[in-house]
């Protein structure tokens, strides 16, 4: 996995994680999440994020996530975490045995903006392509790693220079540990 060759670092390392040359396995901890203020009024900033640093202005990062969600709101996906008030995440968020939400959250200056679409809970893996063009970004998803579809194009007010991006997983309710 090319990502692991770039010396990724943890923001809030999980208690249980396994890393080998081609995958990272995270056992999520209960009560972990990323969300900032909008609509619900609370802020959660304690999810583990495993990411690399870059000043490259033009790139794409492609990663496949596989997950075993069991509790409402379990999440696994990609993230760009700059600080607690400026970050992005895209993932599948488990809802129930029938549906889950494929979505993205953009947080600029401390306020989150969430966009979702419902998908089947039978889907247990997803590819993501995260692309940067200066301080503008695009997130795409794919079930087969070949045919990507756009989820969102967005701007990060604090994302013009050095950024950090990678993968994350969290469990706002129960978790595995």
Regions found by a protein language model. Name each.
Residues 1-177:
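Extracellular glycan-recognition regions
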């Amino acid at each position: 996995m090319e990502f692991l060759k770039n010396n990724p670092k943890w923001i809030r390392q999980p208690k249980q994680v396994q890393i080998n040359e081609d995958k990272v396995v995270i056992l999520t901890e209960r009560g972990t999440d990323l969300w900032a203020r909008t609509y619900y009024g609370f802020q959660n900033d304690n999810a583990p994020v495993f990411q690399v640093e870059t000043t490259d202005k033009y790139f794409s990062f492609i990663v496949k996530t596989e997950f075993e969600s069991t509790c409402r709101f379990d999440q696994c996906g990609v993230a760009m975490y700059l600080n607690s008030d400026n970050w992005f995440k895209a993932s599948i968020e488990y809802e129930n045995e029938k549906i889950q939400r494929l979505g993205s959250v953009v947080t600029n200056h401390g306020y989150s903006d969430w966009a979702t679409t419902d998908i089947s809970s039978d889907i247990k893996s997803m590819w993501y392509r995260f692309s940067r063009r200066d301080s503008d970004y695009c997130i795409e998803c794919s079930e087969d790693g070949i045919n990507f579809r756009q989820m969102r194009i967005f701007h990060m007010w604090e994302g013009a220079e050095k950024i950090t991006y990678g993968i994350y997983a969290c469990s706002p309710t129960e978790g595995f540990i």
